[in-house]
Amino acid sequence: MSIVLAIDTATAAVTAGIVAFDGHDCFTLAERVTVDAKAHVERLTPNVLVALADAELAMCELDAVVVGCGPGPFTGLRVGMATAAAYGHALGIPVHGVCSLDAIGVRTTGDTLVVTDARRHEVYWARYRDGVRIAGPAVGSPTDVDPGTALTVAGSPEHAALFGLPLCEPIYPTPAGLVAAVPDWSVSPIPLVALYLRRPDAKPITADNEPIVIGTLTPADVDRCAQLESQFFDGDNPWPAAAFDRELANSYNCYVGARTADTLVGYAGITRLGHTPPFEYEVHTIAVDPAYRGRGVGRRLLGELLDFAGSGAIYLEVRTDNETAIALYRSVGFERIGLRPRYYPASGADAYLMRREAQ
């Protein structure tokens, strides 16, 4: 019997649960669900700890983690995925990513449409037959979604009601549904990759005919990050692997990477400042392998950080002689607001302080 931590933040629900899994059946030992689309950061870890306490288990007794990887809004989705990756790394246990719609659909019977809120008057959707996905996932206006042969609709009640079909449960991904949605427990899990659907970054971009995929930075990437860091910022106190480890473990942070095949070729990170809204943000770093510069990778990485910050104001520092980076930041609304002399102590280089106003 395996003890699995299941978490999901792809919807308005902040879900954490402890599930016993015998290879066939799932038994929910404890679960905590808070429905608040603006409280993913604040509620996820407390929900995990309370679920563990309710199950009378210690963190060290977990055998695996399962996390919903979307589709879902950027900000909430990253919280769950980063937290799952941090638990897996700290405990030395596998982390399985699943489609959050599957965690709902797998608990349904017959032909069922599953929909969740995609914002912008759209829904994420997929169709299921006896718990197996037969169409989707996709995103679109409710009027453009074809229910097909669905006889019932599950998921967000507000959006499910738009389809004129009988409503059924679940409303949100459940811990047992997340565990049941893992396709093959005998296979080592692949790195977590967020499923956005709407943004171009959900699709591979190419560089010299090599597919480059933007995805979550994981603890398995820290050595490669440190290697690249020493190349990019030689003379400016490059971060060691331990520094990246610490940043990835902080649920207030969002770190993303650009990969070609199995090689990390770029990364970027941002942190949320403060504990109460309105929040502000600070870009920690953006770096792209010189061999892949000039192909839009840095702009894609920056776009992920801007999505994480949403409408909040964003700050960053940049070397005064890095004209390419300055031009990129200006193109998305950053303006110079100050100068920090000798900001980089090792090289003595100055930095501009830049700000993007709240949107």
Curated annotation (Swiss-Prot):
Chain ranges of the N-acetyltransferase domain: 212-359
GO molecular function: protein-N-terminal-alanine acetyltransferase activity
Gene3D superfamilies for the chain: 3.30.420.40, 3.40.630.30
Keywords: Signal
Annotated Pfam families: Acetyltransf_1, TsaD
GO-annotated biological processes: tRNA threonylcarbamoyladenosine modification
Signal sequence bounds: 1-15
Name of protein: Uncharacterized protein ML0378
Species per Swiss-Prot/TrEMBL record: Mycobacterium leprae (strain TN)
